[in-house]
Amino acid sequence: MAERVTVPDMMNAREARAQAQRTLLARYPGAAVVCLCMNIAGPVKRTENIERAFAWGAAQVKAVLAPYETLFDAAIHEKTGPEAMICVRAEAKAVKKRLCALEDGEELGRLLDIDVIAPDGGKISRTDIGLPARRCLLCDKPAPVCARSRAHSVDALFERANAMIDAHFEAAFAARTAENAQRALLCEVAVTPKPGLVDRHNAGAHNDMDVFTFIHSACALRPYFENCARIGLAHRGGDATACFDALRVPGLLAENAMRRATGGVNTHKGAIFSLGIACASLGMGYGAPLDVHETLMRCGAMTGAQMHKELEAAKAGQARTFGETIYQKAGIGGVRAEAAGGFASVREIALPRLEAGLSAGLPLNDAALCALVALMASTQDTNAVRRGGEDGAAAMRGEAQALDGEIVRALEADELQQKIGRLKERLTDWDVRMSAAGISPGGCADLLAMALLMAFCEEDEGNGGNEGNEGNA
C-alpha cells in the first residue's frame, strides 16, 4: 500500500479533484462542496496508518455535517492518498467554521486537510472566516512559513504525523477499554435478582452499601482502568510480569479512590485487581485481533509467578489476608488462583454461558443471571466462605448446581426463554434466604464483571474495533 508518488501524480490528482468539484457545483447549484484529504508530507501518501486516520477523519466530518442535507458523498483510495468528496446544502462559510473547529479542536484534526468550495467555485480560506493560519506539526509556528522556508525535513514531518496517528488511536483504545470496564461494573450491579448480592431490588447480605454505592465506585474507577490499559500498551512485546508489577501502585491508588467515593466502603477491591489486570492484558494485545482466550491467558502469565509465591507463603503459615488464610486452611485459592490460571472460570464457564443465554434470545440481565448461577455452581467463592463458613458456601454451591442443571437442560431443549421467568422467581426466593443468612458470593460477582468486560470488548471488535467512534469512510 505504501507506494511512492511523484509530483506529476499529485498534480494529476489535484486537477481531477478540481474537476470533480466543478461537476458537483454544476449539478447542485447553491450547494457547498467539502473535500477531505490528509495532510501528510512526503512521497508516501497512503499507508494502513494513513487510511486509519482518514477513516476517523471522514467519520468526524460527516458528524459535523449531519445537520445539513447531504447531496453527494463518495470516497476514493488512490496511491496519491485517500480523498472524500461531500456536497451539502448549506452556506459555505458556516460549513468552513464548523470544519475548522474540528481541525483545531482535535489533535488528529491537525492532519486533516479540509477544503470547502463555495457555489461560485472559490475556496473558503481560514482568513475568510477570521482564523489564523494553521500551526506547524513540529515547531508550532505558522505552517505556511515553515513550508515556504522548508524548515523541517519531509522525513521528520512524516514521522511526526505517524506518531500523532498512533497516539490518537492508542488513547482512544485505552479510553474505550476503560469505558467497557466501567460498563461491566455498572451492568453487574444492575443484574437482578442476584442471591445475596447488591442489585436493583435490594442490598442483599450487605448493610453498608447499595446500588448507588456501586455506581459511585464504578465512576471513580474509570480513570484507573484507563491507566491500566495504557500500562498494558506500554508493555506490548515486553515482560508480562513487569506489566503486572507496574499495576501495583495504581491499584493501591484506585482502592483509595474507591473508598473516597463510597465513604470507606469496599465495593470493588476484587474488581480493581481482576479488571485492572484484564485492562492491562487488553493493552498488551493491542494491534492484533481480539482473542479473549489469549487475553485471559496473558492475565495468567502476568500474575502467575507472584500469585503462586503468595499462595505458597500462605501455605507455609505466612498468611496476611483472609484469602490467604482460607488457602492455608482449606486450599481454596480464590482470586489469586483464578488469575494465575488465566481466569479459567471466565473462559470456560461464565463467558460461554453468557453468550449462550444471549444467543437463546435472553436480554443481557437474564443471560448474566445464568452466567452468575454457573459461576456459583462451579467456583469456591472465598467471600461466601468468609461470610457463611465452608458449610454455608458448600450449601450455596449445591443449590446453584441444581439450578444450573435446570438452565442447561432448558438451553438444550431451546426452552430457556419460556422458563427464565420461573427461574428468576426462584432466584428472588433464594436471594431472601441468602441475604438473611448473610452470605454474599462477591467473588462470583467479580468474575461475572470480567465476563461482561470480555463480552463488551468482543462486541466492539464485531462493530469494527475497540477505538470508539472512529468509523469507516
Predicted regions and their residues:
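Asparagine/serine/threonine-enriched low-complexity, disordered tracts
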Residues: D460-N472
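Short, hydrophobic/aliphatic alpha-helical segments
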Residues: L247-G264, L423-A437, A455
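Long, hydrophobic/aromatic-enriched structural stretches that serve as scaffold segments
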Residues: N227-M284
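Short, well-structured hydrophobic secondary-structure segments
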Residues: V33-E91, M209-R236
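Phosphate-rich cofactor/ligand-interacting catalytic cores and adjacent structured alpha/beta frameworks
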Residues: A163-A240, F244, L282-V432, A473
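Short glycine/serine- and small hydrophobic-enriched flexible loop segments
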Residues: P223, I277-M284, L452-E459
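Short, conserved charged micro-motifs
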Residues: R46-T47, A92-L99, L290-E294
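Long, contiguous binding/interaction regions
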Residues: M1-A63, H77, K97-E170
